[in-house]
Structures are given as structure tokens and as C-alpha cells.
């Protein structure tokens, strides 16, 4: 596990019993004036030349100006200027990477048609093995063209990267306010929750790199795409600018009885 930034130093300023209970691997509350560059990287551009449209025919250009911290929240804005769509994307590659844990993210969705906010993870070895060999864990995906639906998915070499290990769940008030998205990532399964309600558990038939490439370090990505294969061709420009808010991220070690 790579922890160049010592998040566990939090335990030094807490009482020992609280540390033992929480077993925090990583915690980010965005309570600062600027993005913590010891934790995060900006991703910018349109993915070209190697991954134009970010591999999904997305319309946006990522620019760090569309990532902000406001009132203790991470805010990613999607906007159209002239003929160009802009949005923001950050990742924790080479800075915060870990294997297994209970991941909780509190977020408020952008809901315009054509928008695609997401909180997800990629295998830290993606530069060496490529995708989908790296594996992908989609903790939250939402698309404005399917209101009231949350997507939780996994991508593996066995699925050839296709979204077959997935669950679409109808949640009546998902567009209203903040909700807590959780993934329990273990050596045997990955399970997804929203506001404490279990949505989907993925358990492979075989625990090999083809079917379960999830026994290694992964890193976070947070972004909002515009259009694309999942976001859809129709974009409601009257809904822009629209904002995707993330209140906090917390990762704790698996409980002994997971």
C-alpha cells in the first residue's frame, strides 16, 4: 500500500480507543481552501491522442478550473462555453492507493440530461497492464437521462470491459440532497450500498485475474462526463452549468467479521 501522505497520522491526535474502532486508511473532508495535491491529481484535456473522448465518446474537455472547494465540499462543474463543453476530473493515482476496505462517499448529484457524475476506482497497475486488466470498481454512476437510477458496476478482463457485472437500482429521492454511497471491498466479494441499503454483491465463480482483478492496490477517480456512450447523445444545455458535490470520502479497514 502506498501512503506517501501519512493519513494515519490522524490517529496520533485522537484517543487510542477511537483509532482502534475506526481503523482509518484514508479520510478526505475537503475542508481547506485548495485541493490537497499530496492526495489528488488533476486530469485535463479530451483524452487525445491515446484515448480521445476518454474511451467513451465523451464531449467534455476536462480543466482544473472546473474543480473547486466550496464550504467544505468538492465541487465539479459542467458548463458549455461557445461550442465546447467543460468539466472537471481528479484522481489519487500514485498518492492514495490501497487494497480492500470499507469505502464511504457522501455526495450530491448533478442531474441534467446528458451528465454523468461518477466516483470510481482503477487498478494502480493500469499503466503496465492496461484496461480492463487493471479492473474497475464503479462505486457510483448516475446519468441524467435515466432519472432516479444509480449504477454500481465492476469491469474485469473476463467481461472484456463490458458492463455485465452491474446493478441498476431505482431510488426515489436520489436526486434530492446528499446520499452516502458505500462499497465493501474484500478478498472474496465487493458489495455496494446507498444510505445503508444493500444494492448489489459481486462474487466471482473463479478468483483469478480474469474474473477478480481486485486483489491489489486501486486509486480513486471523481469526475463528471458530458454525453458519451453512457451519458447519452442528448444534452440538456438549459441545465448547464450544473454541479456535482462530494462532501467527504472515508476508507476504513475491513472488520474482522466482514
Write out the residue ranges for each language-model feature.
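Bacterial Sec-dependent N-terminal signal peptides
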Residues: 1-21
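GH16 jelly-roll
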Residues: 21-258
Amino acid at each position: 500500500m502506498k501512503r506517501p501522505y501519512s493519513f494515519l497520522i490522524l490517529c496520533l491526535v485522537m484517543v487510542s480507543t477511537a483509532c482502534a474502532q475506526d481503523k482509518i486508511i484514508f479520510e478526505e473532508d475537503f475542508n481547506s481552501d485548495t485541493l490537497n495535491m499530496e492526495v489528488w491529481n488533476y486530469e485535463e484535456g479530451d483524452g487525445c491522442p491515446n484515448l480521445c473522448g476518454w474511451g467513451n465518446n465523451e464531449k467534455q474537455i476536462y480543466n482544473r478550473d472546473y474543480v473547486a472547494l466550496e464550504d467544505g465540499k468538492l465541487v465539479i462543474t459542467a458548463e458549455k462555453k461557445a461550442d465546447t463543453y467543460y468539466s472537471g476530473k481528479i484522481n489519487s493515482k500514485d498518492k492514495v492507493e490501497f487494497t480492500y476496505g470499507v469505502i464511504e462517499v457522501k455526495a450530491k448529484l448533478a442531474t441534467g440530461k446528458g451528465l454523468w457524475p461518477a466516483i470510481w476506482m482503477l487498478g494502480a497497475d493500469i499503466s503496465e497492464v492496461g484496461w480492463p486488466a487493471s479492473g474497475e470498481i464503479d462505486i457510483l454512476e448516475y446519468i441524467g437521462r435515466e432519472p432516479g437510477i444509480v449504477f454500481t458496476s465492476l469491469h474485469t478482463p473476463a467481461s472484456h470491459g463490458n458492463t455485465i457485472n452491474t446493478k441498476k437500482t431505482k431510488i426515489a429521492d436520489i436526486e434530492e440532497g446528499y446520499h452516502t454511497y458505500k462499497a465493501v471491498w474484500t478478498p472474496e466479494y465487493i458489495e455496494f450500498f446507498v444510505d445503508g441499503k444493500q444494492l448489489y454483491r459481486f462474487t466471482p465463480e473463479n478468483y483469478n485475474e480474469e474474473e477478480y482483478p481486485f486483489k491489489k492496490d486501486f486509486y480513486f477517480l471523481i469526475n463528471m462526463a458530458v454525453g458519451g456512450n453512457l451519458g447519452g447523445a442528448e444534452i440538456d444545455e438549459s441545465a448547464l452549468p450544473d454541479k456535482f458535490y462530494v462532501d467527504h470520502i472515508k476508507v476504513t479497514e475491513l472488520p474482522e467479521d466482514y
